[in-house]
Amino acid sequence: MTVPTDTVSRRLQSLAWSDIKQHAPWLPSSRTLVSGFLCLILLQILYSRGRKSDLRVYNPKKWWELTTMRAKREFDANAPAWIEAWFSKNDQPLRFIVDSGYCTILPSSMADEFRKMKELCMYKFLGTDFHSHLPGFDGFKEVTRDAHLITKVVMNQFQTQAAKYTKPLADEASATIADIFGDNKEWHTAPVYNECLDLVTRTVTFIMVGDKLAHNEEWLDIAKHHAVTMAIQARQLRLWPVILRPIVHWLEPQGAKLRAQVRRARQLLEPIIQERRAEKAKCLAQGIEPPRYVDSIQWFEDTAKGQWYDAAGAQLAMDFAGIYGTSDLMIGGLVDIVRHPHLIEPLRNEIRTVIGEEGWTPASLYKLKLLDSCLKESQRVKPVECATMRSYALQNVTFSNGTFVPKGELVAVAADRMSNPEVWPEPKKYDPYRYMRLREDPDKAFSAQLENTNGNHIGFGWHPRACPGRFFASKEIKIMLAFLLIRYDWKLVPNEPLQYYRHSFSVRIHPATKLMMRRRDEDL
């Protein structure tokens, strides 16, 4: 007997829905989804009646298009070039269609007013664009909790504990570099991007979770790849209507991978947390001072003061923030130095003198002024994002020049001032001594340091919207580069130009980046 096609179709739909309900029983019924979809349409109609931005949209939807998909894809592919082209000639804001909707991008001249506006929320951006309400995005759920525990730990503990972790961090970096880069004294081509990424992953995790997990290959794999999986899944979900995302994320392979990584991270971390808590309770019961560990597990416990927090989510968020941004600046800094070989010996002399006399301390890292200047210049020439400090408007916002941003829309600041010839002489030129000279001026010495921010250099954002982990990243990068420059000779691979990976707001060193290297007969 032949079964009608429509009957088969209905059965398949029923089976598919049953499978979804089995794996996600909390999902709403089909009737609820239809009702929700109609409500969404109604809300969209009501929202469209509100005041709109009168700014020009650079990549508008064509009149015949039903969706903004083409515009979003074109922004993903062309955003850095578009933003640079517009703001190099115009000191006026502009609107774009990005993967999460409309985004008003402001010129850097408006950054000072922007950064002070409490109506513009970075946490809202992180929670919305990285789907903090969905399983697998547990790191962003912890980041956006009202307690803001992660921000407190990064801003307070990573600063006050620097004297305790700098030397252990240097020792870990030294051993890791020997393991990854080896002792080959012949010139050879090295996949420097991949090797530096592994180096950063291992040194970051050493401070984040301590010695035991920092040498656990399974944890290192999660730390290294979870951020990539999360970024891919977040981007894919942003292309779907909001109401469908709670369903779609259960059906996509990246979503399953993301949730598996979180589950395994919990399984690896939880025994260590419980062991330390039991150890502390036992010591206190015996009137003994509990041991204190120099890692962020300890600092989260101290800062939480007994209040619940998601320990695994916190650590995954720290890895997301601390590995790839740090790697990009470190690799970019190394490549720029190698592209200007006359820099290598002055840098080695500085490292020998400072570290040789004072050892590994926060104070000695501060004195690596040429290395600091090189890194800040690398960040100026190639910022990691072409527009930064993204935030959502919690209410309608009007800037002093009349620029209007509707409630619920995204706002960012272009990095145009970092390449403005009126601010920086010869802005296209990599000048490694640029910020070293500025440090000689008492009025500019503070902002000329890598870890400090101002309106002329927003590579780390601008306080209070600056990257809170920049102080730790600065120390870590200097330690790693000091070892790499002293231990190895470097040169460019012939006929292999430097490449960047440009996608949406990001401008990053290409993963295929390679350099030539060989071991030297010197060490720190």
Curated annotation (Swiss-Prot):
Catalysed transformations (reactions): dihydromonacolin L carboxylate + reduced [NADPH--hemoprotein reductase] + O2 = monacolin L carboxylate + oxidized [NADPH--hemoprotein reductase] + 2 H2O + H(+); monacolin L carboxylate + reduced [NADPH--hemoprotein reductase] + O2 = monacolin J carboxylate + oxidized [NADPH--hemoprotein reductase] + H2O + H(+)
Pfam families named in the record: p450
Q: What does this protein do?
A: Cytochrome P450 monooxygenase; part of the gene cluster that mediates the biosynthesis of monakolin K, also known as lovastatin, and which acts as a potent competitive inhibitor of HMG-CoA reductase. Monakolin K biosynthesis is performed in two stages. The first stage is catalyzed by the nonaketide synthase mokA, which belongs to type I polyketide synthases and catalyzes the iterative nine-step formation of the polyketide.
- Keywords from the named record: Endoplasmic reticulum, Glycoprotein, Heme, Iron, Membrane, Metal-binding, Monooxygenase, Oxidoreductase, Signal-anchor, Transmembrane, Transmembrane helix
Q: Which residues lie on this side of the membrane: Cytoplasmic?
A: 1-25
Instruction: Give induction info.
Output: Expression is controlled by the monacolin K cluster transcription regulator mokH.
Q: State the taxonomy lineage.
A: Eukaryota, Fungi, Dikarya, Ascomycota, Pezizomycotina
Biotech use, per record: Monacoline K acts as an inhibitor of HMG-CoA reductase involved in cholesterogenesis. Its hypocholesterolemic activity might be useful for lowering cholesterol levels in the blood and reduce artherosclerosis and coronary heart disease.
Q: Which stretches are Lumenal in the membrane topology?
A: 48-524
Indicate what this protein is called per its UniProt record: Dihydromonacolin L monooxygenase mokC
Q: In which pathway does it act?
A: Polyketide biosynthesis; lovastatin biosynthesis
Which residues are listed as membrane-spanning?
Answer: 26-47
